[in-house]
């Protein structure tokens, strides 16, 4: 008897049916916006993450040396991969590029609520537009994904910030500040106690007094963020606040501004983020961690050897989305769904197989007996797979040139002429033949 590996999960059919619904919903929204599906490898060179992703992800890599002596890693995230893919075909691709991909990723971290060592995400990215409209479209896709899953604005909150505001404020202090390290501290602000957070800012180069001032500035009211440029005397901060406002204005045009909250304590810990960043949270706090996040990474393509290319994207994680949907009561029941079970009694397989094939050709989920079971065993199986309708094809039925249609929810049944079933009906049921 073997157990599954810690942090890795099995998904049985009932669970997968609900998960498939969620994945299809996310991908359908992206495709309605014109995002095109791509496929990506499970392995990448380890050095790609060492160079591009930041210390936290590098520490969590599943990395090893393959039989050819190459250092490789299971992909912990997709953004570096799609950046590499974009650079490889940059001259051939018509821009802007809009890509979507759903697949598993791997990080060696401690499993906890909504976090596993193997996890699934749907990545959505735009390459080739620096316009606030691109940021707003990404935010609109995120909101539409959530609402198409059945969530309402009362269920979630998307917190929006700007990395250039954070870096500009940090650089305005007269201190030798490690800006990326300080931003990583901000990203962990809600996950550690306040003193530990201030210690992290101090380790990044701020004095404790400056750290307190910086933290107070992060909590400024959204309506007053534009004053940060004057407070800091930083032109970079002024430019960033203008850009953030332009994104919010575009989000208003997309119809999603009401779902966005400006929060400068939102930072995103990965080093490659540049401009607008955002994270989605459960508005009740019951799902304690971020549901998903995203933002701009305008420098990453150039860092991969490509021409300077602005980019923006996000990646909803399926595990945390499931937690949010379950908390809100919109996650579908984890049960099998079968339209028809074609039950055969005696030597009736040719007719039963023909009926099953006809129903499948109409797009229905149809099962039939493949184990030579008794009538009672087949009925029990039909109930177990949640079949809506059972088509009974018995020898006595066929002698009368008919089959029996039985609805499983109420037990009603009716005899139907064999020549009339399935007939011209797209979804033939008891009601179509009852007198």
UniProtKB/Swiss-Prot annotation:
Biological process annotations from GO: histidyl-tRNA aminoacylation
Annotated region (Disordered), positions in chain: 415-435
HAMAP family reported for this sequence: His_tRNA_synth (MF_00127)
Location of this chain's protein in the cell: Cytoplasm
One GO CC annotation: cytoplasm
Gene encoding the protein: hisS
Name of the top EC class for this enzyme: ligase
Pfam family, one: HGTP_anticodon
SUPFAM superfamilies named in the record: Class II aaRS ABD-related, Class II aaRS and biotin synthetases
Protein family membership: Belongs to the class-II aminoacyl-tRNA synthetase family.
Domain of life: Archaea
Reactions mediated catalytically: tRNA(His) + L-histidine + ATP = L-histidyl-tRNA(His) + AMP + diphosphate + H(+)
UniProt-recorded name of the protein: Histidine--tRNA ligase
Biased composition (Basic and acidic residues): 424-435
Keywords tagged on the record: Aminoacyl-tRNA synthetase, ATP-binding, Cytoplasm, Ligase, Nucleotide-binding, Protein biosynthesis
Native source species: Haloarcula marismortui (strain ATCC 43049 / DSM 3752 / JCM 8966 / VKM B-1809)
EC numbers on record: 6.1.1.21
Single annotated GO MF: ATP binding
């Amino acid at each position: 008897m073997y157990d599954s590996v810690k942090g890795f999960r099995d998904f049985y059919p009932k669970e997968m049916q609900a998960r498939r619904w969620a994945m299809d919903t996310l991908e359908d929204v992206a495709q309605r916006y014109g995002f095109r599906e791509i496929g990506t490898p499970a392995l990448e060179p380890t050095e790609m993450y060492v160079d591009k992703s930041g210390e936290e992800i590098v520490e969590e890599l599943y990395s090893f040396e393959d039989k050819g002596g190459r250092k490789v890693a299971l992909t912990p995230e997709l953004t570096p991969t799609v950046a590499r893919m974009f650079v490889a075909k940059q001259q051939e691709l018509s821009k802007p590029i809009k890509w979507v991909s759903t697949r598993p990723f791997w990080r060696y971290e401690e499993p906890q609520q909504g976090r596993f060592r193997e996890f699934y995400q749907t990545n959505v990215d735009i390459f080739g537009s620096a316009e606030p409209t691109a940021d707003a479209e990404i935010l609109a896709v995120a909101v539409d994904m959530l609402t198409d899953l059945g969530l309402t604005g009362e269920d979630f909150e998307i917190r929006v910030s700007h990395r250039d505001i954070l870096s500009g404020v940090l650089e305005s202090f007269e201190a030798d500040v490690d800006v990326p390290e300080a931003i990583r501290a901000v990203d962990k602000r809600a996950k550690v106690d306040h003193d530990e957070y201030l210690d992290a800012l101090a380790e990044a180069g701020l004095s404790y007094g400056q750290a307190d001032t910086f933290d107070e500035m992060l909590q400024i009211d959204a309506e007053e963020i534009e004053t940060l440029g004057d407070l800091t005397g930083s032109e970079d901060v002024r430019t960033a606040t203008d850009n953030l406002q332009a994104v919010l204005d575009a989000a208003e045009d997309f119809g999603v501004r009401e779902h966005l909250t400006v929060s400068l304590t939102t930072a995103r810990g990965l080093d490659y983020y540049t401009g607008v960043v955002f994270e989605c949270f459960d508005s009740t706090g019951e799902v304690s961690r971020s549901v998903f996040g995203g933002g701009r990474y305008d420098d990453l393509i150039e860092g991969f050897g490509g021409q300077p290319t602005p980019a923006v994207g996000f990646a909803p994680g399926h595990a945390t989305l499931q937690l949010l949907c379950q908390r809100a009561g919109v996650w579908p029941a984890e049960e099998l769904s079968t339209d028809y079970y074609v039950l055969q009694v005696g030597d009736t397989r040719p007719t039963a197989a023909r009926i099953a094939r006809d129903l499948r050709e109409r797009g229905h989920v149809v099962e039939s007996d493949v184990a030579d079971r008794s009538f009672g065993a087949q009925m029990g199986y039909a109930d177990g797979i949640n079949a809506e309708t059972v088509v009974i094809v018995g020898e006595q039925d066929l002698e009368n040139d008919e089959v029996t249609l039985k609805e499983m929810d109420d037990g009603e049944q009716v005899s139907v002429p064999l020549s009339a079933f399935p007939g011209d009906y797209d979804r033939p049921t008891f009601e179509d033949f009852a007198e």
